[in-house]
Amino acid sequence: MKKIFLAVLAVATVFTVSAQYKAPQIVANGGYHKHASSGAKNSMSALKAAQKLKIYGSECDVNLTKDGKVLVVQSGWHPGGKANPKADVQRSSAKKMLDIPFANGEYISTLEDFLKRAAKKPATKLILDLKSQATLQRETKLVDEVLAIVEKAGMQSNVEYLAAHPWVAFELVKKAPQGSAIAYLGNDYDPVYVKGMGCTSLDYNIKVWKKKKNWIKQAHKLGLVVNAWVVNKEEDIRWCIQNGVDIITTDEPVLAKKIVKEMCGKQK
């Protein structure tokens, strides 16, 4: 009888510990690129691998070519591997960029192609990180093009936006459909200012949140979503859960899922 009581007590204790934390959502940074069959951030296979995990979202970077085409690519210099040619996305034509392979042999995707794939598994949102451009005019062009492509694909309710440059954030707030999720991706503005910008979320590096932990409660009081990136270490994932972070963006979504389940029960 005593053994049964202790077993029940142990189960109750585990449940109590798990129940005290709210489960954060998980976003795969650049897709699940560490999956054996993907291996490249922003590749189509990385998006597919993230969708198979049934997590909240898969992040990808969107950039504007010299001739105004929106491509899914991480930065100015395409990460094609040392043996492959490099090109500045913003100073190159779409044709040139689309001919450069990723290190895993895949090629860059257009935003249209990514949205087609996202539509097949709408439970996993596509998180679009609009990259800063050389001029404000190009940033406005990028915002306009992205919003038009998303609208044409009928994916407004399945897409969220990240903006590292304030101008991109202001343009998104002004032009995106009402109710769109728009995060300021930076580290310099406090929650009050970000709320004033019209954004719905702060997407800051884990180091910023640890340094300014009071911003988490402040953001929540203002109705803002708190997102931390790039959270890869087990201790950092646990810290985010313990401190009420709403979204964890990570290169290690499988590890994050495991820890969320352990500390919070089944992810919502």
Regions from the PLM with identified roles:
Residues 1-22:
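Bacterial Sec-dependent N-terminal signal peptides
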